[in-house]
Amino acid sequence: MLIAFQTIIHTLGNKMDWFKTQILNDKPVVFDPLRRQWVSLTPEEQVRQKMLHYLVGTRKVAAGLIAVEYSIKVNNLLKRADIVIFNNLGEPQMIVECKAETVPITEKVLDQAIRYYSGLKVKYLTLTNGKSMFCYKVEEGKIEALTEFPL
């Protein structure tokens, strides 16, 4: 069920030069403009920041409609979706699951996003490791792979 499409991933790129980074307590950190705080620059965070840059800079999603590390209750457990995008009415529209570039996007990653969907009904699921992106439309319990980014 995983169908990759090469989309605007070139804007995700390999460089972090458009991001504000520094060393804090001997560890690299990046300033997240959406959360308005410095966060540890892990490989997954690097992909998350690139995806946020793509969403706001290229896709023109309003920053105020994006939540980062959004808490979702799944089977009485509190989980965190990497990115949730809302519509203008405040309704969740998409869950984006980010993985480090070295982590392949597999059915296991899709299963994780589906679990998050069970706690937060959205129209779309997106999976990315910064090199590949997979998008799905979820409707009436059916998941359809898309060939382009839906927003």
Question: What residue ranges belong to the model's regions?
Answer:
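A short, conserved, highly charged catalytic patch centered on acidic carboxylates
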Residues: 2-124, 130-151
